[in-house]
């Protein structure tokens, strides 16, 4: 039910949005580029929201947490899918069967053409799986754990995921933020005429 309501909220936001490009402002050196704000402007406010997930090494799971909107560290992901793709080290039985059915072997070499598709490669020098922006995503690993599973690198943990969870700090005024538990999201708003 909550997911259905959240989906309706997102749809309403996107339909009602007047192309708001402004997002909550952080103190210098505290903007976290991994945070994905969804924003819209109405007659009174600019409103934005975000959800954050972190990787819990003890449980090998990605969990939602109460991020404040600024700062923190790299163990912060805008979706559970992004967190799992970057951090989960053990492939599930389903994933193993899925990749076996694909019957496609991905190369453990690190050569690639730079592009805009985020994938994983094996760095042959350090023997570690690393994220890279590639041109042809079909020939590179879609997730960190698939790279680890196929290439057996020296390190099986992603540096993004080794940090403990940090809740960060709140955006600067005039942004006002509050947590809406029903949507499990942080909402921030700013009156339209404030600077």
UniProtKB/Swiss-Prot annotation:
Entry GO terms, CC: extracellular space
Keywords in alphabetical order: Blood coagulation cascade inhibiting toxin, Disulfide bond, Hemostasis impairing toxin, Protease inhibitor, Secreted, Serine protease inhibitor, Signal, Toxin
BPTI/Kunitz inhibitor domain location: 26-87
Coiled coil: none
Subcellular location: Secreted
UniProt-listed GO biological process terms: envenomation resulting in negative regulation of voltage-gated potassium channel activity in another organism
Tissues with expression: Primarily expressed in salivary glands and weakly expressed in the midgut of fed ticks.
Chief localisation class: secreted
MF GO annotations: serine-type endopeptidase inhibitor activity; toxin activity
Disulfide bonds: 26-87, 39-70, 62-83
Induction annotation: By blood feeding. Expression is most important during the early stage of feeding.
Domain of life of the source: Eukaryota
Signal peptide start-end: 1-20
One Pfam family linked to the record: Kunitz_BPTI
Role, per record: Anticoagulant protein that inhibits the serine proteases trypsin and elastase, but not thrombin. The anticoagulant effect of this recombinant protein on blood clotting is found only in the activated partial thromboplastin time (APTT) assays, but not in the prothrombin time (PT) assays.
Protein name as catalogued: Anticoagulant protein rhipilin-2
């Amino acid at each position: 039910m909550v997911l259905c309501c959240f989906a309706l909220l997102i749809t309403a936001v996107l339909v009602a949005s007047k192309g708001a490009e402004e997002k909550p402002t952080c103190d210098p050196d505290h903007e976290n580029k991994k945070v994905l704000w969804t924003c819209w402007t109405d007659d009174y406010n600019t409103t934005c929201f975000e959800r954050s997930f972190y990787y819990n090494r003890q449980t090998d799971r990605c969990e939602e947490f109460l991020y404040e909107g600024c700062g923190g560290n790299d163990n912060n992901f805008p979706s559970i899918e992004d967190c799992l793709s970057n951090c989960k080290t053990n492939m599930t039985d389903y994933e193993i069967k899925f990749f076996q059915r694909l019957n496609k072997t991905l190369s453990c070499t690190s050569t690639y053409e730079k592009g805009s598709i985020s994938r994983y490669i094996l760095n042959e020098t350090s023997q570690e799986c690393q994220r890279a922006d590639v041109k042809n995503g079909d020939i590179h690993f879609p997730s960190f754990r698939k790279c680890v599973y196929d290439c057996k690198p020296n390190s099986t943990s992603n540096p993004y995921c080794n940090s403990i969870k940090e809740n960060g700090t709140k955006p600067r005024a005039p942004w006002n933020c509050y947590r809406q538990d029903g949507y499990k999201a942080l909402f921030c708003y700013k009156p339209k005429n404030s600077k």
